[in-house]
């Protein structure tokens, strides 16, 4: 089990910038981020360039029309559950 933190970012389009400000202050190297819902629409935000482990649910990626960044990994629901269990700390930001 990883001692790093898994951040679950789920927000509406208009509240995403404030949520990203919070997580950017908490994020440490080795942490992972999962984008959920409208949060995937902020994929071009500069914060995500420093995230070495970035995920999004495959269902939510259907919201994007541009090609996916190479550092963004798609998750189905089973792998999402496994990912959550792999981290000792999981923080959900909405």
PLM features: what roles do these ranges have?
Residues 4-20, 32:
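Short, glycine-rich nucleotide/cofactor-binding loops
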Residues 7, 35, 91-93:
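Redox-cofactor binding/interface segments in oxidoreductases and associated redox assembly factors
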Residues 12-15, 37-41:
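Short beta->alpha connector loops
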Residues 17-18, 63-69:
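Short, charged, surface-exposed secondary-structure boundary motifs
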Residues 24-29, 45-52:
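Short, conserved loop/helix-junction motifs that constitute active-site signature segments
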Residues 33-38, 53-60:
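Short internal beta-strands
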Residues 40-44, 62-65:
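Short, charged/polar "capping" segments at the starts of alpha-helices
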Residues 66-94:
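C-terminal structural segments of small proteins and small subunits
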């Amino acid at each position: 089990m990883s001692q790093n933190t898994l951040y679950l970012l789920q927000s509406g389009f208009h509240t995403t910038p404030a949520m990203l400000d919070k997580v950017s202050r908490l994020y440490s190297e080795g942490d992972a981020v999962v984008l959920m819902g409208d949060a995937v629409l902020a994929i071009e935000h500069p914060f995500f360039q420093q995230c070495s482990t970035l995920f999004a649910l495959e269902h939510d990626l259907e919201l994007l029309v541009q090609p996916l960044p190479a550092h963004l990994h798609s998750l189905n629901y089973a792998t999402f559950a496994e990912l959550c269990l792999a981290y000792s700390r999981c923080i959900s930001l909405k």
